[in-house]
C-alpha cells in the first residue's frame, strides 16, 4: 500500500502556479498507479502503441507487432506474434471472445480467443483502425470495419464468406473509429462521420475545426458515452453530439436520424483522449509547449483533467500532471486514454508506461486527510463509513489523531478524544495513561478515565491520585469526590493523605478529603471528628445519613459552637437517640449554649423540660432578658419565689412586678411601678388588669400630689372608676397640666357610656320582645299525641288501648307527657304548673303545662 501511495504522489503532482496555494489543498478526485508485473518487462524491450480494455482483461499492442493479453494486474496471460511492425489498433467485442487487430504493414486479423475461426487479410497500405461489431460473437452480427485510406465494412454472408463494402473514401486516412450499437463513428482528415448500420445510411458529417493541425500528429479522439451520445476531441476542440430520431414528417429523402451538437468548447491543451465519468468528462491532454500557465519542467507532462461540460464551455473539476516514463520524448499522438465502463478505471497509455487512474474511495479520502494532518476529519469520515472502508481502522486513525494532538501539545483535547477512540480497550487505556505520565500530563487525562462498568487496574487510578497529591491538592480533592471509591485502594490513599498532613496538619482541603475517604470507608467517627474540627457544613448531613447520634453524645458542645440553630434542631428532632438529660449534662459548663437548647425546647413544648424551668430563670436573666418575662408568663412550672429572688437581685422591675402580682401582692407591685418606674400609664394598665377597687384607691392616693399622674388618671380611669372620686380629692389651687382637656375627655367618655348603655338597653328589650313573641307562637301550636308516646312517669303508652273510656293526659311545652293520675300532686290542674323532669334541671320557659283530657 505504501508503494501505491508513493506512486500516486509521484503521478499526481499538481501543475498550478505557486501563488495558488489554496488549490494544492483540494483533494484529488482520482488516484493513480502504474500497471506493472508483465507490463514492466514488455515496455523495457518494446513500446506500447495501443491498448483496449475489457472487464475481464486488457489487450496491449506494441511497436514490434506483438499483442499481449493481460489480467488487470498487468500479468501476461497470452501473447500473439501478429507482425514485425507497429500494431495500430485492437478491437474487442462486448463478450471479450473475439479480437480484431490491425498493423502498420497492412495486416488485419480477426479471430476468436477460444475458437479456431478467424479472418486474415493483408492490404497494400497501412491499416490504422479496426472495430468489431459489439455483438460479433452472435452469428448474425459477424461484421467489422477497417480503415486505411478508406473505410471498409466486412460482413459474413450465408455462405460463410466475407463480403466487403466501402463505407467511405476520398478524404484521406481513417485515423479513428468507434462502434456502438448500430452506429459507427470514424474520423478522417476532413471530419467525423457517423454511419447507421441498421438503415445503411450516413447520418452526419462533423467537420474538424482547426485544419492547420496535422491529423497524423494530433489525431481525433472518439468516445461513445452511451448508445446515442458521441464525444469528439480533436486538437483543442471538444464537441458532444447527440444522435436523435428524426420526425417522420420531416424525413422525405433524409436519414431517419440526425446529430445535434449539444456542447462545444475549446480547451487550452491538445486532446489525446476522452472518457465519460457520469455527467463529466475525463480528458487526457498533451500540454502545449508555449503554455504560460505551466512551469518549464511540467510543460510536456500529460495532464488528466476532470471537466464539467456546459452548453458553451466547461468547468474544470480537477487537474493532475502525470509523470509518465519518458514523457519528455512523447508527442500528442503517443498518448491514448482507454476506460473500463463497469469500474470507472481509466488507462493512460504511453510508449514506455501505462498508468491506471481510478476514482478515489473512502479509504483514499482518509489517506489524503491523514496526509494533510486533518485527523479529526479523517476520524469522522472513518466513523461514518466504517462499514465500507477496507484499509483503515477507526481506532488506529483515532490513535494517530491522539498522537498528533500530543505532539502539538494539545493535551486536553487528546485526553478527551481518548474516551471516544480507546473505547473498552484496557491495554490502550493503560498505555495512554503511562504516556501522559511520561510527559507530565496526568492531570489532563484524569477526568476522562473510565469509571463506570469499564474500569482500569486500581494501580492506574492510585498513580494519578498520588500525582495530584504531590502537585494539586484541589484537583486531588475533586477526583476523590468524582471517582467512585471502588476504583482504588482506599486505605493506601488514606495513608498517603495522612503523610502529607504530617507536613501541613491544618490544610483544610486535605482534611476535608480525608473525611470523605473515611466516609467511603465507613469510618464515620473519624470523618465526624474532622468535620467538627473544620466546622464543615456537611457534618449534619453526615450525622443524619449514617445515624451517628451515638457518636456525637460527647461532641454536642462542638456541634453547638459550629452552628447553634442546626445543632439544637437536630438534637430536638432526635430526642429518642440523644436524651434531653444527656444534652443538658453535656452543656452544663456552657450555660450560654444550654440556654439556647432549653429555650428552643420550651418553645416547642412548655411542659417537656419543666424540671429545668428553675434553672432557666437564671439563664434567661443572664443571657436573654427580653424572653424572661414571656417565659415567666407561659411557664406553669416555674418556682415563683426563686424567680422573684433572682429578679429582685438583678433589679428587673417589670419581671418583679409580674411575679408580685402573680403571687397576690398587687399593692407592692403597683408601688414598684409608681416608685421605681414612675410610669402612670403602666400603673393604670396594671390596675385595669387586676380590676381591684383597692388598687385604684392606692393609685389615686399615690398620684394625688403629683399633677402629671393626676392628668394620666383623668385621661384613663373614666371607664373603670368614677372620675368624681379623683376630682373631689384634688387639692384646691393645684395646677394640673391639660386639666381642661382631661375634663372634656371625662365628660365625653361619660356621655359615650350613657349612650352605650341606652343602646344596649334598647337592644335587650327588642330581643326580649322578639323571643317572647316567638315563644308564644311556638306554645300556641298543637302537640301531636299518638300511641307511640309514653308517660314519662310510668313509661306506658300515653293513650289507653280503649279510647272510648275517659282518660286524662298532661302535656308540657317541653314535650314531656304524663298521665294525669301519674303526676305527684293529684290535686286540681292549676296546682301543676311545671314539668317534674325539667324543673329538676332548671325552671324556665318551656316547662309550662298543657292539659289534654277526654
From Swiss-Prot:
Function, as annotated: Plays a role in vesicle-mediated protein trafficking to lysosomal compartments including the endocytic membrane transport and autophagic pathways. Believed to act as a core component of the putative HOPS and CORVET endosomal tethering complexes.
Question: What family does the database annotate?
Answer: Belongs to the VPS41 family.
Membrane topology, from the record: Peripheral membrane protein
- Protein transport keyword on record: yes
* Primary subcellular site in the record, as a coarse category: membrane
Task: Enumerate the Gene Ontology biological process terms.
Answer: cellular response to starvation; endosomal vesicle fusion; endosome to lysosome transport; macroautophagy; protein targeting to vacuole
The UniProt keywords, alphabetically, are:
Autophagy, Coiled coil, Cytoplasm, Cytoplasmic vesicle, Endosome, Golgi apparatus, Lysosome, Membrane, Metal-binding, Protein transport, Transport, Zinc, Zinc-finger
Q: Looking at the record, which segments are called Disordered? A: 1-30
Subunit structure, briefly?
A: Core component of at least two putative endosomal tethering complexes, the homotypic fusion and vacuole protein sorting (HOPS) complex and the class C core vacuole/endosome tethering (CORVET) complex.
Q: Give start-end of the signal peptide.
A: none
Designated gene of the protein: vps41
Q: Which organism is it from?
A: Danio rerio (Zebrafish)
What's this protein's name?
A: Vacuolar protein sorting-associated protein 41 homolog
Amino acid at each position: 500500500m505504501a508503494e501505491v501511495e508513493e506512486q500516486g504522489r509521484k503521478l499526481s503532482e499538481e501543475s498550478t502556479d505557486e501563488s495558488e496555494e489554496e488549490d494544492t489543498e483540494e483533494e484529488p478526485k482520482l488516484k493513480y498507479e502504474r500497471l506493472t508485473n508483465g507490463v514492466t518487462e514488455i515496455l523495457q524491450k518494446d513500446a506500447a502503441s495501443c491498448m483496449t480494455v475489457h472487464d475481464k482483461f486488457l489487450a496491449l499492442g506494441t511497436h514490434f507487432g506483438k499483442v499481449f493479453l493481460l489480467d488487470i494486474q498487468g500479468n501476461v496471460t497470452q501473447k500473439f506474434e501478429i507482425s514485425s511492425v507497429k500494431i495500430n489498433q485492437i478491437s474487442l467485442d462486448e463478450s471479450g471472445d473475439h479480437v480484431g487487430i490491425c498493423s502498420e504493414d497492412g495486416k488485419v486479423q480477426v479471430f476468436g480467443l477460444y475458437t479456431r475461426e478467424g479472418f486474415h487479410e493483408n492490404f497494400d497500405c497501412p491499416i490504422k483502425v479496426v472495430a468489431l461489431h459489439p455483438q460479433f460473437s452472435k452469428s448474425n452480427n459477424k461484421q467489422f470495419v477497417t480503415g486505411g485510406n478508406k473505410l471498409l465494412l466486412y460482413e459474413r454472408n450465408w455462405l460463410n464468406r466475407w463480403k466487403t463494402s466501402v463505407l467511405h473514401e476520398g478524404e484521406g486516412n481513417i485515423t479513428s473509429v468507434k462502434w456502438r450499437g448500430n452506429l459507427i463513428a470514424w474520423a478522417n482528415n476532413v471530419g467525423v462521420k457517423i454511419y447507421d448500420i441498421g438503415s445503411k445510411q450516413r447520418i452526419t458529417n462533423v467537420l474538424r475545426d482547426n485544419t492547420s493541425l496535422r491529423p497524423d500528429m494530433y489525431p481525433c479522439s472518439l468516445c461513445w458515452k452511451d448508445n446515442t451520445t458521441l464525444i469528439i476531441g480533436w486538437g483543442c476542440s471538444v464537441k458532444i453530439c447527440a444522435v436523435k430520431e428524426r420526425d417522420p414528417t420531416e424525413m422525405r429523402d433524409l436519414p431517419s436520424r440526425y446529430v445535434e451538437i449539444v456542447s462545444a468548447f475549446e480547451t487550452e491543451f491538445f486532446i489525446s483522449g476522452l472518457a465519460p465519468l457520469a455527467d463529466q468528462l475525463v480528458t487526457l491532454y498533451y500540454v502545449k509547449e508555449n503554455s504560460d500557465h505551466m512551469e518549464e519542467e511540467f510543460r510536456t507532462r500529460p495532464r488528466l483533467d476532470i471537466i464539467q461540460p456546459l452548453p458553451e464551455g466547461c468547468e474544470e473539476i480537477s487537474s493532475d500532471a502525470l509523470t509518465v516514463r519518458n514523457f519528455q520524448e512523447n508527442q500528442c499522438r503517443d498518448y491514448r486514454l482507454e476506460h473500463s465502463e463497469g469500474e470507472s478505471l481509466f488507462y493512460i497509455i504511453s510508449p514506455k508506461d501505462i498508468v491506471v487512474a481510478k476514482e478515489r474511495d473512502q479509504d483514499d479520502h482518509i489517506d489524503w486527510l491523514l496526509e494533510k494532518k486533518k485527523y479529526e476529519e479523517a476520524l469522522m469520515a472513518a466513523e461514518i463509513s466504517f462499514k465500507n472502508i477496507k484499509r483503515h481502522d477507526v481506532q488506529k486513525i483515532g490513535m494517530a489523531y491522539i498522537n498528533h494532538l500530543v505532539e502539538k501539545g494539545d493535551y486536553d483535547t487528546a485526553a478527551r478524544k481518548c474516551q471516544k477512540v480507546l473505547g473498552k480497550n484496557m491495554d490502550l487505556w493503560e498505555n495512554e495513561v503511562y504516556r501522559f505520565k511520561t510527559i507530565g500530563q496526568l492531570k489532563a487525562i484524569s477526568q476522562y478515565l473510565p469509571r463506570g462498568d469499564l474500569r482500569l487496574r486500581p494501580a492506574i487510578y492510585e498513580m494519578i491520585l498520588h500525582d495530584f497529591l504531590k502537585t494539586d491538592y484541589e484537583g486531588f480533592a475533586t477526583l476523590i469526590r468524582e471517582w467512585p471509591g471502588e476504583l482504588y485502594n482506599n486505605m493506601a490513599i488514606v495513608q498517603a493523605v495522612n503523610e502529607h498532613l504530617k507536613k501541613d496538619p491544618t490544610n483544610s482541603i486535605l482534611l476535608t478529603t480525608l473525611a470523605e475517604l473515611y466516609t467511603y470507608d465507613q469510618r464515620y467517627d473519624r470523618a465526624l471528628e474532622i468535620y467538627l474540627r473544620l466546622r464543615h457544613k456537611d457534618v449534619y448531613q453526615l450525622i443524619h445519613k449514617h445515624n451517628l447520634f451515638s457518636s456525637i453524645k460527647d461532641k454536642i458542645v462542638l456541634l453547638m459552637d459550629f452552628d447553634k440553630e442546626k445543632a439544637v434542631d437536630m438534637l430536638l428532632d432526635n430526642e429518642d437517640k440523644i436524651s434531653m438529660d444527656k444534652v443538658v449534662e453535656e452543656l452544663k459548663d456552657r450555660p450560654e449554649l444550654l440556654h439556647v437548647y432549653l429555650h428552643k425546647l420550651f418553645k416547642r413544648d412548655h411542659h417537656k423540660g419543666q424540671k429545668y424551668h428553675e434553672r432557666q430563670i437564671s439563664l434567661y436573666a443572664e443571657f436573654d432578658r427580653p424572653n424572661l418575662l414571656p417565659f415567666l408568663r407561659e411557664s406553669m412550672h416555674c418556682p415563683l419565689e426563686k424567680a422573684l429572688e433572682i429578679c429582685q437581685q438583678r433589679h428587673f422591675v417589670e419581671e418583679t412586678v409580674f411575679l408580685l402580682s402573680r403571687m397576690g401582692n398587687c399593692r407592692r407591685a403597683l408601688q414598684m411601678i409608681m416608685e421605681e418606674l414612675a410610669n402612670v400609664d403602666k400603673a393604670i394598665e396594671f390596675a385595669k388588669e387586676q380590676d381591684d377597687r383597692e388598687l385604684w384607691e392606692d393609685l389615686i392616693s399615690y398620684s394625688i400630689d403629683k399633677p402629671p399622674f393626676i392628668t394620666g388618671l383623668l385621661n384613663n380611669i373614666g371607664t373603670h372608676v368614677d372620675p368624681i372620686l379623683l376630682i373631689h380629692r384634688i387639692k384646691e389651687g393645684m395646677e394640673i397640666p391639660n386639666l381642661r382637656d382631661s375634663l372634656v375627655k371625662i365628660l365625653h367618655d361619660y356621655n359615650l357610656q350613657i349612650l352605650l348603655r341606652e343602646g344596649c338597653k334598647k337592644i335587650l328589650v327588642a330581643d326580649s320582645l322578639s323571643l317572647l313573641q316567638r315563644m308564644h307562637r311556638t306554645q300556641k301550636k298543637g302537640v301531636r299525641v299518638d300511641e307511640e308516646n309514653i308517660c314519662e312517669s310510668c313509661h306506658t303508652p300515653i293513650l289507653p288501648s280503649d279510647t272510648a273510656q275517659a282518660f286524662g293526659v298532661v302535656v308540657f311545652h317541653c314535650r314531656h307527657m304524663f298521665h294525669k293520675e301519674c303526676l305527684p300532686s293529684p290535686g286540681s290542674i292549676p296546682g301543676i304548673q311545671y314539668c317534674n323532669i325539667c324543673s329538676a334541671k332548671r325552671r324556665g320557659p318551656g316547662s309550662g303545662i298543657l292539659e289534654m283530657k277526654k
